[in-house]
């Protein structure tokens, strides 16, 4: 097991508790709890993740060595996001492999949250942009999940 996996195994329960508490403001500006039903188990799962808004969509990133994103491989999949203690519903779509769509959205995400760049082995330049060299094969290292929020969330 990688050190990073151990770190997140310890941190995730703490973050779930914090994000559901009245002290959520310490982290909820850019960390959400993604909730979804497992395709095979039909159990509810929750995983804390960094998030970024892009228009009316929410962007989530993951590395290939995690498993949660494998539930979204076939088609848009219903999910819930807890953002600032408010539950938002939407449909999650997985994007993987090399594509301009994935690269541009990963670059947008990391420009908003540069602290996450090291997780995905991306270096940032002095202007705060991901370096071209480290973005070259980003689709081989990073999974992008785009959550299209339901219209009812705006009510």
Regions of interest found by a model, annotated:
Residues 1-24:
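Extreme N-terminal tail/first-helix region
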Residues 23-26, 40-43, 137:
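Short secondary-structure boundary/capping segments within folded domains
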Residues 16-31, 119-123, 143:
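Low-complexity, charge- and small-residue-enriched intrinsically disordered regions
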